Amino acid sequence: MKSSRKRTKRRVLQDMSISGLLLSVALLPSVVSAQDHVYLDPSSSGSPYLGPQIPLTGLPALTGTHEFTLRHIYQRGTHDQPDLHRRLDIKPHTRLWAVSDDGLEKELVTFDTPLVASSSPLTIQRLADRRLSVIEGYLAAARSRGEAVALSPSEWVMDTLAGPNVTDKESVLTFAKMTANDYIEEPGSGDWHYIHGRFNYSSSFGWQSDGLRGHIYADKTNSTIVISLKGTSPALFDGAGTTTNDKINDNLFFSCCCGQGGSYLWRQVCDCQQSAFTANLTCIVEAMNDENRYYRAAIDLYSNVTDMYPDANVWLTGHSLGGAMSSLLGLTFGLPVVTFEAVPEALPAARLGLPSPPGHDPRLPQSRQYTGAYHFGHTADPVYMGTCNGVGSICTWGGYAMESACHTGQMCVYDTVEDKGWRVALSTHRIEAVISDVLEVYEDIPPCAPEEECYDCELWKFFKSNGSESTTTSTTTTTTAPTTTRTSTCKTPGWWGCLDESTTTTTTTSTTTTTTTTTTSTCKTPGWFGCKDPTTTTEATAAPSVTTSIPTPTTYPTSSTSTCKDPGWFGCRDPPSTTASITSSPSTTSTCDDPGFFWGCYDESTTATHPITSGPSAPYSTPSPTHEHTCTSSIFFGLICVGSTGTELR
């Protein structure tokens, strides 16, 4: 009985194991189909167990070698033609011209030398959602709020992708040659595709006169795309014909306040300055985000390229202004960037409100790590080093306000000043000179390092006009002091003053003595520099009086007369001579027998003294006799007396 039960139980267990095995085999296809990029090992086709998960082929490798060819040329209009957006597809029959640095010489292009670059793993911290609509929403919010949008750490990712190998000399030279190539089509050899509808193209619209150009390179598998941005190069930089549009973009993006507050030679492109070294930041940002600016044109150009190559790995490169725009575009979408002699772009990156990872100040984008941007340049280039803004610099004389000094990402600097003894000059900024004299000459690539300890526009103060701006109130206190007013009426004006009689009276009153001083001057013979008449001064000096119930002052006159023997330009240079007497005044009688050549008399003066008599009993003064001289003969229009007669007056 027990043995039969054991046999029955063993049979049930065997049936259950067989059923479980069949069930697992039946469910095996559904389990395999739920996994991506896996396959079953053929050697274990009869096995019910899953094989190892092996990725399928076709995924881009992080390292490799790429051979690039020119595929498209994009042109995005900005100022003259803001609606222009067209594409030229390069085909075997398309004939292109390479434009020289001065914009005058053109030659047919033959693509004999391949453009080869290698890739290496590169880690970039970027947004997880990089769709154009999402990025535009962040930028619009930054413009309305006046600062970058604060995002959570979950919205950022650390991606390791295939990036340009910046330690390989051949790869760096390839990117430099991409930025140096400036191609235009031979008329009639290519068909332009107008992205926003058919454009009424006019022959007067020059290829190099407006807009941002993008040269699109692709490798043989279309897995890696290189966009080389090239702005219209100013004549001061690359020798091409400069336009006003370049100064507008340069001074708007790379100046502290749109070319204001500095040299009068700078072209001012906005009116955002409020006072000395104080500006409205909201006003500047609004001007930078206009649709006819290079940054907005670069976003449109990039979005159209990614529509054509949605699954490709995109790299960016550029020179000078194009390099700065490439760097801003790379910071916006998290793309690898290689630039050459780029204008320092940390200042516009902070003002545009580009999203910044947590833990980094969005106002200091130069402090960000893992940006994937590498800026190659040398120390003799004032644009790259941020020193082309002095009073005597060529940039200033050309009207360019290049005040920014800080780069984002990594700086790879060739020290040509120390190694080669170069002088800092704007001629070393040209990309052709950089390729032939720097990149091809140096055997090793310089080390790259971030530029963290760098600050732009430290002397300036910026405020926002959305209601949070600071207000400064100053109070001025005015103190009014008494003002003394003197009124004079001149009846006989002269060359150096008034020739009227001047009378000054000073009266001092005391209980016993009263003093009165009277000076009277009457000019009968005016000269060029004053009166030439003898000076007579009468002074009245009070003497002690007999005091009764009412004090009565008694004065006795003293008369003095002086004659000038050595007249000067502005007065008499003789020592003063005065004869005084208590009861009578001496009188001086002079008759000029030897007049001077121009003026004055050279005779010696004779002084007569009257005898002393007793004082009068009455309290009044006795006048002294005076003498009057009459000129009988004069020369030089009556200015000089030659002969005179004297008459005594009582």
From Swiss-Prot:
Lipase which is essential for lysis of subvacuolar cytoplasm to vacuole targeted bodies and intravacuolar autophagic bodies. Involved in the lysis of intravacuolar multivesicular body (MVB) vesicles. The intravacuolar membrane disintegration by atg15 is critical to life span extension. Residues 1-11 are cytoplasmic. Keywords: Autophagy, Endosome, Glycoprotein, Hydrolase, Lipid degradation, Lipid metabolism, Membrane, Signal-anchor, Transmembrane, Transmembrane helix. Binds to both phosphatidylinositol (PI) and phosphatidylinositol 3,5-bisphosphate (PIP2). Residues 33-650 are lumenal. One of its GO terms (molecular function) is phospholipase activity. PANTHER family: LIPASE ATG15-RELATED (PTHR47175:SF2). The gene is atg15. The active site is at S320. The lineage of its organism: Eukaryota, Fungi, Dikarya, Ascomycota, Pezizomycotina. Its EC number is 3.1.1.3. Belongs to the AB hydrolase superfamily. Lipase family. This is Putative lipase atg15. The keyword NADP does not apply. It is a single-pass type II membrane protein. It comes from the Eukaryota. It is found in: Endosome, Multivesicular body membrane; Prevacuolar compartment membrane. The chain crosses the membrane at residues 12-32. Glycans are attached at N165, N200, N222, N280, N304, N466. It comes from Aspergillus fumigatus (strain ATCC MYA-4609 / CBS 101355 / FGSC A1100 / Af293). It catalyses: a triacylglycerol + H2O = a diacylglycerol + a fatty acid + H(+). The keyword Lipid metabolism applies. It holds the Pfam family Lipase_3.
